[in-house]
Regions:
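Macrodomain-like recognition of ADP-ribose-binding/processing modules
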Residues: 1-163
């Protein structure tokens, strides 16, 4: 079941948090920056992965924290190539492909709940009315609660329905 909530995704009790990024992203804004600051080991491992594997847009990369929670980075944006270059914009086909991979990952790892923000609708400029149907299509049949943090409220813990 998919639920739209207001609150701070960092207070979510979900077993996995997903976010949209670019391959080689520097995590300088929004949720990515907050995760980079709270989990520097995740960011270090992400950078190493990108430098050694050269991931493509439309894929995912996951990381498990010490408390057993997954952070799943969805490559929704065009990559940042070259030192100091900025990531490109998000594209709907990248969002769709990465959500499909996320669905497969959730089933494979038996993840019991997922939280994600309004993917690719912040700095990257996609229209939520085009992104939300992709989430419904790719994640709607999962038999777990999926929490979309549609309205960010810093420091506010949302009430997450169990299903």
């Amino acid at each position: 079941m998919i639920h739209e909530l207001s609150g701070d995704i960092l207070f979510s009790g979900a077993k996995a948090i997903a976010q949209g990024v670019a391959p080689n992203d520097d995590f300088l804004h929004g949720l990515a920056l907050q995760l980079r600051e709270r989990m520097p080991a995740m960011y270090k491992d992400f950078r190493h992965y990108c430098q050694t594997r050269h991931p493509k847009s439309g894929g995912i990369w996951s990381w498990m924290s010490a408390d057993g929670r997954y952070i799943v980075n969805l490559f929704t944006r065009e990559a940042a190539y070259g030192v100091g270059s900025k990531p490109g914009h998000a594209k709907l086909n990248h969002v769709n492909h990465s959500l499909h991979e996320l669905s497969d990952f959730i089933q494979k790892e038996k993840i019991t709940s997922l939280a994600l923000p309004r993917l690719a609708c912040g700095l990257t400029g996609l229209d939520w009315n085009e992104v939300r149907p992709l989430i419904d299509k790719q994640l709607g049949d999962l038999r777990i609660p999926v929490y979309i943090y549609a309205n960010y409220q810093k420091g506010v813990k949302a009430i997450e329905p169990p299903k």
